[in-house]
Amino acid sequence: GIQSDIDNKAVDSQTIFELGSVSKIFTATAGAYAKSQGKLSFQDHPSKYWPELQKSEINKVSLLELVTYTSGNLPLQFPDNVKTDQQVLEYFQNWHIKNPPGQYRQYSNPSIGLFGEITARSMKVPFTSLLENVIFPKFNMNHTYINVPKEQKEYYAFGYDQMNQPIRVSPGALDAQAYGVKSSLPDMLKFLNANLNPEKSNSDFKKAILETHKGYLKLGNMTQALGWETFSYPTTLAILQESNSEKVVMRSNPVVKETTQEKSKVFHK
């Protein structure tokens, strides 16, 4: 393949790609790592780390419910008029619960975005710094970024829109937490190897990786882990397609708590 239609430069091991929602796995891993360091509990509520949310309904939602998309009413995307940090705060301050937290799954960038922001606040660093200076190095990912450095721009592949025009990921509210990671193929192979062989990581990071694999909720044949969605192995193409259906991605669906952990899983994002 080529990196860009503009110069027809071939894709190689240095090419940097936008990961989209795969970024959510890194956000979940950061939260699991913060938990392993005793910086937060998944049963905590947002105002413990963001006091301005103390009197808002979002404070009735736990961090676990945020990372598993079960807040009760957070939508797929922020409204178009929410752009600045202050607007993000005001959005959460004025948000209202619709369904009981923990009982309905609604895939949501604001939900995992807030989880990532709370994680960073618990670690007392900006979210971008947490990923670029702590999480990526622990995976030994040396060419993975939130903000692609100037000297790496020549390796940064373009995406293409429906009109076949080159585009970059659009900036947005809590974008780094939900869809902001860019990486190379060799780095992503390191990431996959760490998840397939977590015992090779040092003890605190092994604990964080394994935490992201734990299933918490079940929606049909799909189990919601942290960042990942998993399925019993073996599974079928039809089951995987169902998990990407409009109903699952765009709507609120009742879930049941997962009490058993499958030994063999198919991981999906």
Where are these regions (language model features)?
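Short active-site loop at a secondary-structure junction
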Residues: 6-65, 97-111, 176-179
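Short, surface-exposed loop or secondary-structure junction motifs
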Residues: 2, 56-268
